[in-house]
Amino acid sequence: MQFIDQARIAVKAGRGGDGICAFRREKYVPAGGPSGGDGGRGGDVVLQADSNLQTLLDFKYKRLFQADDGRRGGPNRSTGASANTLLIRVPCGTEVRDLGTDLLLGDLTDNGEQLMIATGGKGGLGNAHYLSNRNRAPEKFTEGKDGEERELQLELKLLAEVGLVGLPNAGKSTLISVLSAARPKIADYPFTTLVPNLGVVRRPSGDGTVFADIPGLIAGAAQGAGLGHDFLRHIERTRVLIHLVDGSSPDPIADAQVLLGELEAYGNGLLERPRLLVLSKSELLDEEQLEALPAQLSDTLGQPVQVISAVTGQGLDGLLQQVWQELGVSS
């Protein structure tokens, strides 16, 4: 399935039905009064979060959504039928913004959560409303009102508590595949991961925590280089970041500094949240490197460094314990 995390759509609520002009015509009522009924209300447009959806792909092929109009009134003061609400389903984690005003209308995070985005027009009034002592046979009636129209920007931000970040080939996909049941594509070339991958990591208690593997970032990602700008938004909701540094890289310290620079450039508080610094691929390092690299990284970045290998399992239990501690959950 193609992963689409941004979409623009236009929505239009239904128009209210017109009121009508009508008079009673019963056989034994020779001077029948006005009996024109009111029009029905136009259909509203509502967005609803659906946990079964993972992408905004559907909106790539359909971008105009229009609710039905209300029905016109009838004789004998009968009100026209109101139109049904048009329900548009979106993935949990979808932010909705009005393109005309740039206002954030809502953030649908919980399954079943709804957001009214366009209200249907009111029905017009039939001539029965205009009966008075002065006018016993009014012919006045009103048309239904137009429904609201909006152009919307939909933006999906994944609902993960832990985000894995690092330069291409830092070992993020391998790590998430070992820790969870996720099976991302893994290969030895940059940008193997082209979309974010989610995996649920189970704690001994049986509860699950969602990890997100964010596609590899490169220098300039915050300004749109590589794949990073498209996917940095997906770590905005995370509570903890795992910063993976490839220990087999020619210059792991420079790699770590590049990624920190991108997080800082993107902003939105990414540098302020808890971040675990992890040196990966320890199985590829000799004893001298295993002793020197963690100390150099720690001295340069000013924080502790954990050493892991997703291949041998070294350090994984300790890493998870730190994650649970940062999240404030029991292991």
Curated annotation (Swiss-Prot):
PROSITE patterns: G_OBG (PS51710), OBG (PS51883)
Location within or outside the cell: Cytoplasm
Keyword Magnesium in annotation: yes
Top class in the EC scheme: hydrolase
Domain of life, source organism: Bacteria
Limits of the Obg domain: 1-159
Keywords for this protein: Cytoplasm, GTP-binding, Hydrolase, Magnesium, Metal-binding, Nucleotide-binding
Enzyme Commission numbers on file: 3.6.5.-
SUPFAM superfamilies: Obg GTP-binding protein N-terminal domain, P-loop containing nucleoside triphosphate hydrolases
Domain OBG-type G: 160-328
Physiological role: An essential GTPase which binds GTP, GDP and possibly (p)ppGpp with moderate affinity, with high nucleotide exchange rates and a fairly low GTP hydrolysis rate. Plays a role in control of the cell cycle, stress response, ribosome biogenesis and in those bacteria that undergo differentiation, in morphogenesis control.
Quaternary data: Monomer.
Protein name (database record): GTPase Obg
Chain's gene name: obg
